[in-house]
């Protein structure tokens, strides 16, 4: 339960009043809105605790969008509720039973028919508590804010509560990510608690892709060895495979077996096993593969797609390969939403990088002005210097 926040540490002005609403209105449906880093997932788990405290035999289920988010949520469940069902939306479609409590995260990603089906699977006195942020809608089939209000019959049958404080992000990260937030005005008006105000956002410039890959691996490994459990966010799986291949080349290890890619399906379990057996402290997280628990216990670097990173957070986040020809997604609106998601995954350090002369158009003047710009070659020399880097596992900035 490393990321779970006990009730004694919740905010008394927003978070605790929401939980009081939940407790005072049994059977009432809720939609909890909040920007990235506002604590929505933590509050959903507290809703489960409230329900179980009142009725230990209550039949509850948690419904999520990605397997990586399931892995994180399971890690936050108290031991006594570890057997609570936690499923993806796709798995939930095949359930033919009703529940006293259905907790749903990332409602903005659901198509209309899924939202209606979820609402239909409560018991007579049961309810659904949704959480989500329209600004993080990253799928073509997503439902609009108005459509969600219509389905939930707000305000007659459901109550909307909005969180207006941001706990995870620094002011710097909020400023650069605001460029890609649909509700920019309210996002910029939200109160940032800013526990990491002095941590810089870095932009690393490499001469070429080979140097960028070498820097990315050496630097992320340095963070991993120091206990930061860093994540590398990459937009697509093809680029992930190319980076893993580069890491194996850098470490002089056997390359990937392309038989592990069957009919377009990448066998990431075999790739993770190959990395582990060759002593490479790197794992792919997503599609049921990889684990947060293993990342923390073994000081692994985690590599994950933008899509799979939604709902997650990491102490240190790398977003590499932001050169002019890097494709985040075919549809520009969704590409911007995905970039917003990626930028808001870091709770402490955010490190962007690109190679060559031209940067990605998403690296705007505003973003660049907020970054500390460094050269990949200089950073590689620093890492190779035995007097540089991180020492004694201290919680310090290493960039």
Segments from the language model and where they lie:
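Conserved RecA-like ASCE P-loop NTPase motor core of nucleic-acid helicases/translocases
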Residues: 31-70, 163-165, 178-276, 285-286
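Inter-Walker segment of RecA-like/P-loop motor cores
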Residues: 60-100
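SF2 helicase catalytic motif II
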Residues: 98-114, 128-130, 135-139
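Conserved coupling/interface region of RecA-like P-loop/ASCE motor cores
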Residues: 3-9, 136-140, 150-196
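Core RecA-like ATPase module of SF1/SF2 helicases and allied nucleic-acid translocases
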Residues: 38, 83, 88-96, 101, ...
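N-terminal pre-P-loop "Q-motif" helix
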Residues: 1-28, 114
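Structural recognition of the conserved hydrophobic beta-strand(s) that form the central parallel beta-sheet
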Residues: 126-133, 162, 351-352
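Short, conserved "post-DEAD/DEAH" coupling segment immediately C-terminal to helicase motif II
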Residues: 112-126, 145-151
């Amino acid at each position: 339960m490393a990321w779970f926040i006990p009730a004694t540490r919740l905010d008394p002005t927003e978070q605790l009043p929401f939980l009081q609403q939940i407790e005072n209105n049994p059977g009432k449906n809720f939609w909890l809105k909040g920007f990235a880093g506002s604590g929505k997932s933590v509050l959903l788990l507290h809703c489960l605790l409230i329900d179980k405290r009142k009725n230990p035999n209550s039949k509850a289920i948690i419904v999520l969008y990605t397997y990586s988010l399931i892995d994180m949520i399971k890690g936050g469940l108290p031991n006594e509720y570890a057997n609570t069902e936690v499923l993806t939306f796709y798995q939930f479609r095949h359930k033919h039973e009703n529940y006293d409590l259905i907790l749903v995260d990332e409602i903005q990603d659901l198509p209309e028919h899924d939202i209606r089906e979820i609402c239909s699977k409560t018991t007579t006195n049961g309810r659904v508590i949704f959480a989500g942020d329209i600004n993080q809608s990253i799928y073509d089939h997503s439902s609009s804010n108005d459509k969600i209000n219509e389905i939930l019959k707000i305000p007659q049958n459901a109550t909307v509560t909005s969180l207006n404080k941001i706990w995870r992000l620094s002011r710097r990260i909020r400023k650069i990510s605001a460029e890609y937030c649909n509700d920019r005005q309210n996002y910029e008006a939200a109160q940032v608690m800013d526990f990491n105000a002095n941590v810089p956002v870095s932009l690393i410039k490499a001469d070429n892709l080979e140097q960028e890959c070498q820097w990315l691996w050496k630097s992320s490994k340095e963070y991993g060895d120091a206990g930061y459990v860093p994540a590398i966010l990459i937009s697509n799986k093809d680029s992930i495979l190319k980076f893993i291949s580069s890491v194996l080349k850098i470490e002089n290890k056997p390359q990937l077996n392309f038989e592990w890619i069957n009919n377009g399906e990448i066998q990431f379990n075999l790739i993770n096993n190959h990395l582990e057996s060759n002593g490479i402290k790197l794992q792919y997280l997503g599609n049921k593969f990889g684990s947060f628990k293993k990342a923390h216990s073994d000081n692994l670097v985690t590599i994950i797609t933008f899509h799979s990173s939604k709902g997650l957070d990491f102490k240190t986040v790398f977003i590499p390969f932001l050169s002019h020809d890097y494709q985040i997604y075919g549809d520009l609106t969704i590409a911007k939403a995905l970039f917003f998601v990626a930028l808001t995954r870091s709770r402490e350090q955010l490190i962007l990088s690109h190679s060559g002369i031209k940067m990605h158009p998403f690296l705007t003047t505003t973003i660049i002005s907020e970054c500390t710009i460094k050269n990949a070659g200089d950073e590689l020399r620093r890492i190779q210097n035995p007097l540089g880097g991180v020492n004694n596992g201290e919680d310090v900035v290493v960039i």
